[in-house]
Amino acid sequence: MNERLNSPLMFLSVLLYCGAAAGAAGLAAMLFPRQRRRGVALLVTGIALVLIAVCWPVRERRVVDAASRLDRIMPRWQFEERHEIRIAASPDRIYSAIRQVTAGEIRFFQVLTTIRCLGRCRERESILHAPDAKPILDVATGSGFRILADDAPHDLVFGTRVAPRTFAVMNFHVEPDGRLTTETRVFADGDAARRRFALYWRIIRPGSGIIRQSWLEAIKRRAEGKQ
């Protein structure tokens, strides 16, 4: 398994949460007279860390030589995450598992999506409110996502508009040796859209990474017959 944990955007998410925790600890310490000086220091440190995380500039990346369907579909992006896993199964079995895996098989999926939308996504079926027993890709394509490439048993690419002028694309790529990768890319068109999505991404990035890795593990269990 592998994830780009050292990517700047993941680091900024950690910085954001550390700043929020330091600020909260500082406010709590300020309630006690003997701890007020320490509380002020923690609060100032926390605010500084949050401001650094929020204001850090976003760098755009571009594909030079398209090597995959994903490269051709989204050659420019500012936000990304990538995960991979090794599966002891044929590409056909892996691809079938990708299409059939359900939200109920993905550990922490329901908990993290509920936290992500603060309980406000429970009225209609969507990727953030997916039934346990329905294939998660069927839920996605029925609620705003479109299949952009379906090259069985190696490439599946789908995407959606996540906000005005902001587009997300995600893929699953199966190698002949059983290596499965998934990559998410987001392109925000314009400075205002980029700033808005940057804050959102830095907040949800840790939970998103957990979901993506758990999703791959669920595919692995299904493909290897270990559900």
What name fits each language-model region?
Residues 87-93, 148-155, 173-180, 223-227:
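A short, structured loop/turn motif at beta-sheet edges
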Residues 41-42, 53-137, 142-144:
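Hydrophobic ligand-binding cavity/cleft-lining segments
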Residues 1-3:
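N-terminal hydrophobic targeting signals that begin at the initiator methionine
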Residues 15, 19, 25, 196-227:
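A conserved amphipathic terminal alpha-helix motif
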Residues 6-18, 32-43, 54-66, 136-177, ...:
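Hydrophobic-ligand binding "helix-grip"
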Residues 21-27, 43-48:
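Hydrophobic alpha-helical topogenic segments used for membrane insertion/localization
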